[in-house]
Amino acid sequence: MAQVRGSFEALYDNVDKDMALQAIMRGQLKELPRVYTKYFNVRTSDRKFERVVTYVPFSETATKGEGETYTFDTLRQGYTKDFTHTTAGLGFEVTQEAFEDDAENVITQAGTWLAFAARYLEEGRAANPLNNGFGTETTPDGLSLFNTAHILKGGGTAKNRLSTDADLSASSLAQAMIDTQTDQKDEAGHLAAPITSWKLVIPPALEFTADRIVNSVLLPGTADNDRNPIKSLRTWDVIVNPRLTDTDAWFLIAGNKSQHGLTFYRRIPITVEPMDKDPKTKNRIITTRHRFSIGAWTWIGTFGTQGA
């Protein structure tokens, strides 16, 4: 349906515009900054889908007696994860008259608003692996992204979720740090080096709690004069994501992006096409489209809990 003058009369009534309209259209309300790029691996793609394959490394070496043959092992394929790109787009059509009478240049900025709509969608989609990480968002082992029993291809299990979900506190965060040291394993069950730099991703409701926990020099919320080991033993970056839907859930993501598998593949970037004109009506048409995929090809380097 084309934009006509009657559907937005305030733009064409030849009187001073309401200040609320001015605030929206003239940029006094600012767009939310991008959040997902702070912790996602953002990569470009030139294929219709991307496939990530993990592998099972060698087991431990075996005792070998003098003159005896060596024990041999093989590298094996682990799990496979496909990222299938989806296309999103939006169009805007305006009549010739509405375009001509656009005294405030609102209609001519339609391309900017279309790009904003695309960015807003991407930000929301990028929050889904965390929002759905305890249910429908799965890793290649078929289990939820945050789970207490991830299946290792070489045998055994590992977890990246508290055994009993807990609200964010100094004690629950300390337990998460312990769990990441005992359960960050490769597919053969080998323990990985402890991750010492973390991004703590939280909803706005936990911002002040998180700041007290990770930035207090002394133990927060106690009368003890002990130092705060959460601050002294780890490096933290608190990231507030307003697109998280659970006000109690909190997440840990490795500060070094190469140590986790949260990935955003960009097949076609946000593209606003040049303004077109309908030859029959002379209506102006503007469209935008983008193709991308989002997910986690491994649970390693992440940790999450739903809260109590």
Regions found by a protein language model. Give the residues of each.
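Short, well-structured alpha-helical interface segments that form or flank functional binding sites
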Residues: 87, 102-109, 113-116, 195, ...
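Surface-exposed acidic, glycine-flexible loop patches that form ligand/cofactor-binding
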Residues: 135, 186-193
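Glycine-rich, often proline-containing surface loops adjacent to acidic residues and nearby aromatics
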Residues: 85-100, 157, 194-199
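Alpha-helical scaffold segments that mediate packing/assembly in large oligomeric complexes
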Residues: 97, 102-109, 116-179
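N-terminal alpha-helical "arm" segments
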Residues: 1-28
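Structured alpha-helical segments in the cores of large, soluble enzyme domains
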Residues: 74-84, 175-189
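Sequence/fold signature of self-assembling virion shell proteins
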Residues: 2-9, 148-185, 196-199, 205-308
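Assembly/oligomerization interface modules of large self-assembling protein complexes
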Residues: 26-88
